[in-house]
Amino acid sequence: MSQYRRYFDESDPNQSRYSSRNGNGSYYQSRGSQRYNYEGQPDESGYRKDYQKSLGAGNGQYNNRQYSRNDNGSSNNVPQGRYTPTEYSSRRSFHHNDAEIKLPSAPSRVQYSYKARNSETKDPNAYRPNHTDQSYIRGRNSNGKSYGPVNIPTGPQQSRIVSNRNHNQHNVSLRPKATVKYKNIEQLTCKYHYFDPVEKVLTHRTEMKKWTEVNKDMPEVGFVVQQETINGQVKSVIKSRKPDEKSTDPRKTTIPNTGNSSTKKKQRTARKCRKELTLVPRISYDKFSLGPPPSTEVVVFAENFSNTQMANIPDISIKNYFRKFGELAHFASYSDPKTALPLHLYLVKYTHPSGKINDSAKAAYQAVKSCQEQKCCILGCNFNVLLNKNNELENIMNKRITVLSKETEKVKLQMEQEKKSALKKSAELNKEEKGILKPLKTIPGDLRPIVNNRPALYISRRFISVMGLRLIDFKSKLKAYKCSRFLEHATGFYIIFNNLEHAKLCMDAESGKLTMASRRKRTTVPINFILIEPFTSRFSKKYKDVPSDSKEKVEIVRYNNKEELIDAASKYIIEDLAKTLHTEIRKTMIGPAVFDTLQPSNFPQLVQKRKEQEELKKADMEKKKAEQAKSKDFNIFNLYASYTNKPKRRQKRYLSDEEAEEELPQKKIKPLAHLLDEVREDSPTSGLESTDDPTEGDNMSTSSSSEDEDDIMDDFQNEDKKDDMFSTPETNEEMDYHHKIDYRTENLIDKEIDDASQVNERYLPSATQFPVTVYPENTYDSEYIDTVSLFDLQDAIKDEEDMEFLKECLPAGEDLEFDDDNGLLEYRIWKIKQMADISQSSTNNELRLNNQTLDKTLFEKNIPFIASEFKHIPEKLKSSYLPHKRRVHEPLNTVSHHNESKEQSPDIAIKEKSVNKADTGEGSLAEISSSRDNRASNRRFQQNIEAQKAATGTESELLSLNQLNKRKKPVTFARSAIHNWGLYALEPINAKEMVIEYVGERIRQPVAEMRERRYIKNGIGSSYLFRIDEHTVIDATKKGGIARFINHCCEPSCTAKIIKVGGKRRIVIYALRDIAANEELTYDYKFERETDAEERLPCLCGAPSCKGFLN
């Protein structure tokens, strides 16, 4: 084996020279001519070998290749000939004098044919071997071994050439065509000793130097590395190269044994001959390394990705498994881009805190090595691990996508076959139910006003009830057609159309072809419609189709040739262009010109005239308003008359159009008595107190003093002066007339005031719309009060008149019987009044703190509350002192939010509650919108699950459980107004929506009975046993969710349904009606009625239709 060193010849810049370490030859390489010369020393046979090679194009075949062998000596009686190359084949052979010699298969062998030449011909390329029966054919078999000498026969006999080194024969593929793998990569071109295979030039040749310039101790002819024994150890030594020495095979060289004297005779070779390839030690990657950097990415993929257990493995488990080998920089999982199904293919990329690529590559290598030695098993599933080299990730991904596409096609075919079989079964069922579909020619009488003689499609009630169909199913299936209404009747379903054509179109397209899922038969059933056309008679109006939104059918115009088509198209285009041109001319030219000519600045005379007219109109309006402003009389005896009297004759008022447009809204007419209640801003003082209630103001006005009335009159006089200042001047006659009226009214008012001052203020007349009592009504006058206390009687006597009436009612003083009071009657009356005041104050305190008085049965007679013994308080009495017990039918806000403003009196809280109730309009819209969003998200989630089921072809329990968990609503538990704890909704829930699942321990019926007795014995007051069927019971007493806190109510808001999920029965709570936020959820327990009265449980729901007992 020769080891070559490279140096440069300064004379030829395009040449590089290699020299072998044994010095028997040199190798020149010229990149310009692609010529390879080997000049060797004469060997034992005296041959000199010259090789010339020129590559040609064409499917990997070598053309124009010539091998010649010239000998220095000559020998007689030896056949002379020429070897010419032929095409490649898997079995190579020599042809010599009609004798075929077959050689073993080798990838680098060429088939030769030998032709004997005439001795008279002179061929410069003739071959005259030195030996008549032996020649060397050089090559390698599939195991890399060299072939030895081959015997070439001289006769027509046939023999097989056998290798002296290896007798094995293998099928070896052809060597692939050489390509430039790493081309134009910056990571490679920046290397110091990179050779560009395209340009055939060393990129950094100008920067290179001879080794003698770098290290002068190195010899100029080169050096070789030899192994010598130094101090009993074999070491590698660098020595100067000797070109005259012959090279030796290192496998044949031996090294003397340095062991004991008994084993000195044995010699050992420098190294053993390897029979198979071994791994090259991993070399650290640096700036001098060739090729791409080592891979830091690991590809993880499942062995069997169609396994159903793979869906249960989360990505975090795989990520955590490979995290133990090093720090992760990136983790990604891949899925099918078409079906979105997981490929169970993952990419793990490592990094290192130091940023060195060798450390990251080492971590990836260790991950692959450990997974190859021990199988990578994660949660019971096996995975394969490979380094991401040569686009390994893309190859695996493409293979898996193709496999998945084939599987989805198979699933689709199976589904189509199942659908066809279901259609056949439904057709058979349809034949059996032929008697069900009886044609109905007319619409029932109660529906005729609604249908209004329009076409309809009919489905019989018997068919619907047998198949278990609903009207909402038809709405969703026929939404593509223009249906007017969907009606449900005792006779069946009616689908109304506005147009007969639409009804016939739906009938032809869907009748017998539309399929729906039957809830009773558990199969798809075809739907057959019956068309009911509108009736016509000579007595009724002829039916006319209701105009629809659909456009009329356009007749198809056919043209004979291309010219007619072009003419018609050009005609339509010209018409459209003409229309658009006219509209543009109107918009851009005519319109602006008209507006410019009609501007007011072009007609100044008309503008001035219009302004003058408007000024005259304003003057007339002000004059009329001044004439209508008249003085008003103020007479206290005409207050009620002024309020009730109306003008006898309504005077007509004719206004012009402009006045009618500018007419202001009329003010409400007030009686003159209300002038006393008005407070002027310009008056410094007011004679009346301002109150919110008008009746109170009226009462206060009657009790005002005469001095206040004088002040009021002064104020009115001042106001009249102000009105005179801004009013128009009147004539002398009008002034005299008004002066006389004012003088008379003033005299009358003074006289009446003097008369009224002699009467008690309480009995003066009041200026109110309706009569008002002098004293407030007494509470004992109510029909619901039977007894009258002493204090009520004292309050009833207001004046002397009442005392006289009392004397008339009671008997005479002689007939009265009095007990012996011993002079303590007044004390007793005082004591009774004091006790009454104390009870009234305690009642007021209870109302202020509790908003309700305590039940009297809670207090024992003549015994203090502290001295009373412990006793059980019934649930009915708890509502008197527990606030949450009183709000049975109101939403209970159980979610506590910290708010300091809530720490206030109950009166303020009640006011805020009323304000919140008034402002629920926008909140309800927000709740509806949020619920609508939830339903939309649930529908999208359901569609995704159905798509995944259709793609995989299997329905796993995991999908059903995820679907069930997705649909549940947010609920919580808190203290209940019915009993103990209760379940409450945190957000609005619509009717027929799922609320929560009743979760617990699944047990048998005998075990449930035993546990129930045990719970009663241990003192557990509430047991949460829910029966599914005769044999199965759900026990949520100790192992269950919060659904067990839901209470019973005779008017429930929810209901319990038993559904199947994955072959198992489950209990799910659904809403019966719309439920508000923070409202308690209830459902009917439906206990069996007990005959024994002692075992019956009282119901505490408090509903209007409460049964009174649970069982």
From Swiss-Prot:
Please tell me where this protein is predominantly located: nucleus
Stored Gene3D superfamilies:
3.30.70.330, SET domain
> A Gene Ontology molecular-function term?
RNA binding
Pfam families xrefs = N-SET (PF11764), SET (PF00856), SET1_RBD (PF21569), SET_assoc (PF11767)
* Record carries keyword Zinc-finger: no
Segments forming domain Post-SET = 1095-1111
Give its localization: Nucleus; Chromosome
| Segments forming domain SET | 969-1086
Any single Gene Ontology cellular-component annotation: Set1C/COMPASS complex
Which region ranges are annotated with the description Disordered?
A: 1-150, 234-272, 648-714, 891-937
What does the similarity note say? Belongs to the class V-like SAM-binding methyltransferase superfamily.
PANTHER family registered for this protein in UniProt:
HISTONE-LYSINE N-METHYLTRANSFERASE SETD1
Bias type Basic and acidic residues, positions: 241-252, 897-920
Q: Where are the transmembrane segments?
A: none
List the EC numbers from the record. Answer: 2.1.1.354
Source taxon at top rank: Eukaryota
Q: Where is this motif: RxxxRR motif?
A: 935-940
The entry's function note states:
Catalytic component of the COMPASS (Set1C) complex that specifically mono-, di- and trimethylates histone H3 to form H3K4me1/2/3. Binds RNAs which might negatively affect its histone methyltransferase activity. COMPASS recognizes ubiquitinated H2B on one face of the nucleosome which stimulates the methylation of H3 on the opposing face.
Q: What is known of its domains?
A: The RxxxRR motif forms an adapter helix that bridges the nucleosome and ubiquitin.
Q: Point to the regions of Basic residues compositional bias.
A: 263-272
* GO BP term, pick one: negative regulation of transcription by RNA polymerase II
* Catalyzed reactions: L-lysyl(4)-[histone H3] + 3 S-adenosyl-L-methionine = N(6),N(6),N(6)-trimethyl-L-lysyl(4)-[histone H3] + 3 S-adenosyl-L-homocysteine + 3 H(+); N(6)-methyl-L-lysyl(4)-[histone H3] + S-adenosyl-L-methionine = N(6),N(6)-dimethyl-L-lysyl(4)-[histone H3] + S-adenosyl-L-homocysteine + H(+); N(6),N(6)-dimethyl-L-lysyl(4)-[histone H3] + S-adenosyl-L-methionine = N(6),N(6),N(6)-trimethyl-L-lysyl(4)-[histone H3] + S-adenosyl-L-homocysteine + H(+)
What protein name is recorded for this chain? Histone-lysine N-methyltransferase, H3 lysine-4 specific
Cited InterPro entries:
COMPASS_Set1_N-SET (IPR024657), Nucleotide-bd_a/b_plait_sf (IPR012677), Post-SET_dom (IPR003616), Set1-like (IPR044570), Set1_fungi (IPR017111), SET1_RBD (IPR048669), SET_assoc (IPR024636), SET_dom (IPR001214)
Which keywords describe this protein according to UniProt?
Chromatin regulator, Chromosome, Methyltransferase, Nucleus, S-adenosyl-L-methionine, Transferase
**Presence of the UniProt keyword RNA-binding in the record:** no
